[in-house]
Amino acid sequence: MKNFLLFLLLGISFFSFGKKPDTRYFEMRIYYCHPGRLDALLQRFSNHTTKIFEKHGMTNVGYWIPTNNTDNALYYILAYPSKADRDSSWKHFSSDPEWKTVSKKSEETGKIVAKVTSVFMNATDFSPKIKPSGGAVDQVFELRTYSQLPGRNPAILARFKD
C-alpha cells in the first residue's frame, strides 16, 4: 500500500515538466469513511476544509476518489515548504476555532472518518510541475505501484528519469 501511495504523482499524465526541481514536502492522506459518510466528508472538504488548510499555509495539490471505491475513501495530497512547516500548519489547523466548529457540526449525525493514513513524499528531480488540467473533460488517473529489491531504488528512478 505504501508503494501504491508513493507513486501517485507518477501516474498523473497531464502534468508538464518544470525547469526547477520541486523541493516542497508532500503528504498524501487517505481518509477511510464510515459507511454512508463519504458524502459528508466531501461536503466538509468542499465547503470548509480546503479553505482552512490554505489559511494555515497548506497547499491543496489535489483530491481523488477511487473509481471502484469499495473502501469508502478520499485520497488527497497537500504540499508544504518543509516538514517543519507541515508540523506547524497541522498544529495551527487542529486548534483553529473555525475548524473545531465545522468538524463538530459535520459530525452531529455521527463520526465521518474511521481511519487516516499518511505517506510523506519528496519530488524527484524529473517530477513534472503540477498544474491543474482546467479542462471540462472527466479524467481518470492511474496510480501504479513499483516494488523493487533492496538497493534497487536508484535503478527505478533512473528508468523514469531517462
Model-derived regions, located:
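Short S/T/G/P-rich N-terminal loop/turn motif that feeds into the first structured element of a domain
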Residues: 14-162
